[in-house]
Regions:
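Bacterial N-terminal signal peptides that target proteins for export
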Residues: 4-15
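Bacterial N-terminal signal peptides
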Residues: 15-24
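N-proximal helix/coil linker or "cap" segments that precede and/or mark the start of modular domains
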Residues: 23-45, 204-214
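N-terminal "domain-start" segment that seeds a small globular fold
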Residues: 30-59, 77-79, 143-144
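Short active-site neighborhood of thiol/selenol oxidoreductases, capturing the structured segment around
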Residues: 60-76, 98-102
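Structural microenvironment flanking redox-active thiols in thiol-disulfide oxidoreductases
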Residues: 77-142
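Thiol-/selenol-based redox modules, centered on thioredoxin-like
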Residues: 147, 151-225
Length: 225
């Protein structure tokens, strides 16, 4: 016959066992939306290499509205660089940061030599916005930032970029907000209004459809080369 002490000890162990089994069942499950928001990537998860070869995390621009553009100094659309300068000058105080990423992927219309690239954007184009090193923006060598920006599941519809001067607006939380193709001129009043609305948090997430597989591509003439 078990003693009173033995029965108490056995009852105590049974009680502990019940608690251990019941606690996970009673604990509130995490909201799936919360789980999604925690795992959702932003541009702040990526970094770029600047014209001097130094890596810069995009988290440096937290809280800013970003306009990310792939540049091409030899393109017939290179006058858009002046328009980007104007946007940076006009809206910097309100929180706009223009980010330019040169690339020779589209028609080979960018300088590949780092010294020539630095000289062009600093001395010829007088870029007043952040210009990074020449990068691959499609194919097997596509940089991680552009894999993210062109992934419809994580970012915006539209797929791989089609030509130079494709523009991505990224909100102050680091989430892609809108995409515009080369034929959307940043010098236009309408584009300035778009930026103003985005700065004010009034622009809804959207995408401008590309007009063909090589939307807005430079013509084949050599007039501007």
């Amino acid at each position: 016959m078990q003693s009173w002490g033995s029965r108490m000890k056995r009852s105590f162990f049974v009680f502990i066992l019940v608690i251990l089994i019941a606690c996970p069942l009673l604990a509130p499950s995490e909201d799936p939306k919360t789980q999604t928001s925690k795992s959702k990537k932003t541009v702040y998860d990526y970094s770029l290499v600047d014209l001097d070869g130094k890596e810069m995390p995009l988290s440096s621009f937290k809280g800013k509205l970003l306009l990310i553009v792939n540049l091409a100094s030899q393109s017939i659309y290179r006058d858009q660089i002046d328009a980007l300068n104007e946007l940076q000058k006009t809206y910097a105080d309100q929180g706009l940061v223009v980010i330019g990423i040169p690339s020779a992927d589209f028609g080979g219309e960018e300088l590949k030599d780092p010294a020539a690239l630095r000289k062009y954007y600093r001395e010829t184009a007088h870029a007043n916005f952040q210009v990074f090193a020449c990068a691959s923006l499609r194919g097997v060598n596509e940089i991680p930032l552009y894999r993210f920006l062109t992934d419809a599941k994580q970012s915006l519809p539209g797929g791989d970029i089609h030509w130079n001067f494709t523009k991505f607006l990224v909100d102050r939380q680091g989430l892609p907000l809108a995409r515009y193709e080369v034929d959307e001129d940043p010098a236009d009043v309408g584009f300035h209004v778009t930026v103003e609305n985005a700065l004010a948090g009034k622009l809804k997430k959207k995408v401008q459809s590309a007009k063909g597989d090589e939307a807005g591509g430079d013509d084949d003439s050599d007039d501007d080369e």
